[in-house]
Regions:
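CheY-like receiver
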Residues: 9, 131-173
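Conserved acidic segment of CheY-like receiver
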Residues: 12-24, 29-33, 62
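Alpha4 helix (beta4-alpha4-beta5 surface) of REC/receiver domains from two-component response regulators
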Residues: 30-31, 75, 89, 100-115, ...
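Helix N-cap/capping motif at the beta->alpha junctions
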Residues: 43-52, 73
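Short amphipathic alpha-helix used as the core "switch/output" element in two-component signaling
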Residues: 52, 74-88
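Active-site beta3 strand of CheY-like receiver
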Residues: 57-63
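Active-site residues of response regulator receiver
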Residues: 65, 97
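Receiver (REC) domain active-site loop signature in two-component systems and cognate sites
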Residues: 68
Length: 173
C-alpha cells in the first residue's frame, strides 16, 4: 500500500486523458480527477481525437467511454493495443461506461482494458482504479491477437476452463 504523501505525489505527476463524447461527463471526470490531486488532464470528444492526443501528449492513464460515435471505446482500445502500429500500446486504460453487463466486462478484458468503471462514478471508485493502474500495474502479455494486461486469474495462478485460451500468453514487459 502506498502512503498518502506518496500517492499525492504520484497523482500530481500523472497525465490523464479523458475520452468521452459527452462534455458534461468529461467535466465530471475532470472534477473528480482534480479532487484526488491530478493536475494534468487532457480531454477528447471522440475516439479519433483521443488517439491523436495519446500520440502527442503520451498520457500516463487514459479513461475512455464505451459508447461514442465513430470509434467506440472497445475499438479505441483495440487500436491502442496494437504495438506494431501504435506508439504507446502499454498505456493503462480505464473503461468508463454506463453498461455493466457481463458481456461488456468480458469484451473489455478481451480487448485489453486495465480497469472497468461504471457510471455514475464516484471519487473513491475512480481513485481506487487510478491507484490500481499506477501503483500495481499488471504485466503486459501477448497471446495470438491479444496484447494487453495479463488477466488477473493468470497473475493469481488460477486458470479456469474459460481461461484456457490465455494459457499460451507470452510476457512482453
Amino acid at each position: 500500500m502506498v502512503d498518502t504523501r506518496a500517492l499525492a505525489a504520484i497523482f500530481a505527476a500523472t497525465k490523464v486523458l479523458v475520452v468521452d463524447d459527452e462534455h458534461y461527463m468529461r467535466k465530471v471526470v475532470r472534477t473528480l480527477l482534480m479532487s484526488i490531486g491530478v493536475r494534468t488532464i487532457y480531454e477528447a470528444a471522440n475516439g479519433s481525437a483521443g488517439l491523436d492526443l495519446i500520440r502527442s501528449v503520451a498520457p500516463d492513464v487514459v479513461i475512455v467511454d464505451w459508447e461514442m460515435p465513430g470509434i467506440d471505446g472497445a475499438e479505441f482500445v483495440r487500436i491502442v493495443r496494437s504495438p506494431a502500429t501504435f506508439p504507446f500500446p502499454n498505456v493503462p486504460i480505464i473503461m468508463l461506461t454506463g453498461h455493466g453487463e457481463r458481456s461488456r466486462v468480458i469484451e473489455s478484458v478481451q480487448v485489453g482494458v486495465n480497469e472497468f468503471l461504471l457510471k455514475p462514478v464516484s471519487s473513491k471508485a475512480l481513485q481506487d482504479r487510478m491507484v490500481a493502474v499506477l501503483t500495481n500495474p499488471r504485466p503486459f502479455v501477448r497471446s495470438g491477437d491479444y496484447y494487453g494486461p495479463a488477466p488477473r486469474k493468470m497473475i493469481a495462478g488460477v486458470h479456469a476452463d474459460t481461461d484456457r485460451a490465455m494459457a499460451n500468453l507470452v510476457l512482453v514487459n
